[in-house]
């Protein structure tokens, strides 16, 4: 499966900045205009991606209308962070096509994905294969997913689970302590997880300050998802300022991290048994993604919705005709 537009955008931003801020809007807690205004403040403050989703209630009309309103106000990718098969809307650019790696129930590992795959394909939004790992305390998402929570003290278990996710095909790994977690996971756990991965790694849960964001990025995370830290700010100016300070801290730590990473030529000399020295074999340059500015194709979505409505109307007419014919036969 080829990378979609949103996934290419993520890789391009990481190559340039070394870290991303992903702002989460939960339509159940921030519906309609309220959620759209918060998303706009986040985008203006420097959020790289707007995530939309939640564990409870983020579906149906509330999800559709809120996401559409957000789309009209921001010009960054909107990625769905689904809580179930109902958390899908055509007004987003992409969806975390997630499986909960440490759930005790097969539903969250494969069944819900089977239910959701045809819907994602019909809507034409880009799926991003995502391995999702729930850490303690887990909060609502841990309870709903019936997760075998990974303790913050066991970075080795988190790393092994993340590695399994990548081997199973995940192109993004997310570890989440749960919405409303009192504090983020320790740097040791973040470092352990990132040390085994070659795909982008995002941390979520408990990160509320620029200082905490700096520590998480320095420990190795490629991005931080923030939701609860923005939910309780009624003043949109304060939301914007908070996002701006966290975004600045993430970008600063990310660029420092990029500087400290060895180049491909240097790596080839460190591990000569596995990679030919650069004087014998020069590694090709990494491809750079020229991602165009995000523009939402409203016409395509409206056309799909109109076609779907026509199909429903035709089915309704068929049903009425069938009912009339059936009643005439009985007479």
Per-range role (PLM):
Residues 51-57, 98-109, 177-179, 206-207, ...:
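Glycine-rich phosphate-binding active-site loops on the catalytic face of alpha/beta enzymes
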Residues 17-23, 67-82, 195-204:
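Short beta-strand/loop segments at the ligand-binding rim of alpha/beta enzyme cores
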Residues 19-35, 82-84, 137-158, 202-208:
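Active-site mouth loops of central-metabolism enzymes
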Residues 53, 143-190, 230-238:
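Glycine/Thr-rich beta-alpha phosphate-binding loop at enzyme active sites
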Residues 80, 84-97, 199, 203, ...:
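Catalytic cores of alpha/beta
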Residues 67, 229-258:
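C-terminal helical cap(s) of enzyme catalytic domains, especially alpha/beta-barrels
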């Amino acid at each position: 499966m080829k990378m979609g537009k949103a996934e290419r955008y993520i890789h391009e931003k990481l190559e340039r900045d070394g870290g991303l801020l992903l702002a989460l809007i939960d339509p159940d807690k921030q519906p309609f205009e309220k959620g759209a205004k918060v998303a706009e403040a986040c985008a203006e403050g420097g959020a790289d991606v707007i995530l939309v989703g939640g564990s409870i209630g983020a579906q149906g009309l509330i999800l559709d209308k809120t996401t559409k309103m957000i789309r009209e106000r921001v010009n960054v990718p909107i990625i769905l962070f689904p809580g179930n098969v109902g958390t899908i809307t055509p007004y987003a650019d992409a969806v975390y096509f997630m499986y909960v790696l440490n759930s005790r129930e097969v539903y969250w590992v494969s069944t819900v994905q089977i239910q959701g795959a045809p819907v994602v394909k019909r809507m034409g939004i880009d799926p991003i294969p995502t391995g999702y790992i729930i850490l303690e305390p887990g909060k609502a998402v841990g309870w709903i997913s019936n997760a075998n929570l990974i303790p913050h003290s066991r970075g080795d278990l988190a790393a092994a689970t993340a590695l399994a996710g990548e081997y199973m095909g995940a192109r993004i790994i997310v570890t989440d302590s749960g919405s409303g977690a009192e504090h983020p996971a320790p740097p040791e756990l973040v470092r352990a997880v990132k040390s085994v991965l070659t795909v982008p790694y995002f941390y979520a849960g408990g990160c509320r300050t620029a200082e905490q964001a700096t520590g998480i990025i320095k420990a190795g995370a490629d991005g931080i998802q923030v939701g609860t830290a923005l939910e309780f700010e009624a003043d949109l100016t304060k939301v914007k300022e908070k996002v701006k300070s966290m975004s600045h801290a993430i970008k600063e730590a990310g660029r420092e991290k990029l500087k400290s990473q060895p180049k491909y030529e240097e790596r080839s000399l460190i591990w000569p048994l596995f990679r030919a020295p650069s004087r014998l074999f020069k590694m090709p340059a990494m491809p750079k993604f020229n991602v165009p500015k995000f523009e939402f194709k409203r016409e395509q979505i409206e056309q799909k919705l109109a076609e779907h409505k026509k199909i429903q109307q035709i089915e309704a007419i068929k049903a009425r005709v069938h009912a009339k014919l059936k009643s005439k036969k009985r007479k």
